[in-house]
Amino acid sequence: MVQGYIHGLDSYNINEASLLIRSDLVKVVEAITGNNDASYIFLLIIITIIFALTMYTSVQVLIRTMRTTISKSVMDDNLKKKYGFERMRNKKRKKRSNATDTAILMNTMLDDDSTDEF
């Protein structure tokens, strides 16, 4: 059987090799399903659906990783400034510093009030 595959591929007769592969697949499916045409078609449909779902999920994972890689590598400082990432970060820093200053001021005011005698 392996010699047939190698012979088909060595002589560049791809059709012959693919026919050998198909005939082996048919033999395996017939052995599993009991040589019934309806079950053979049903099994092929199930295999096709599983293959399609596997390809879909792998492509989705590939697209997701490419997006994150591209967004991390392409966005340099100039683009970040252009699209406002740095401005948003600076606004958050200012808000934090303002809140910190307010908290410190409130604590000092409370401390000052507690030391005063009425």
UniProtKB/Swiss-Prot annotation:
Main location: host cell
Keyword annotations of the record: Host membrane, Membrane, Transmembrane, Transmembrane helix
Membrane-topology annotation of the record: Single-pass membrane protein
Transmembrane regions: 41-61
One annotated Gene Ontology cellular component of this protein: host cell membrane
Membrane recorded as keyword: yes
Subcellular location: Host membrane
Protein name: Uncharacterized protein ORF84
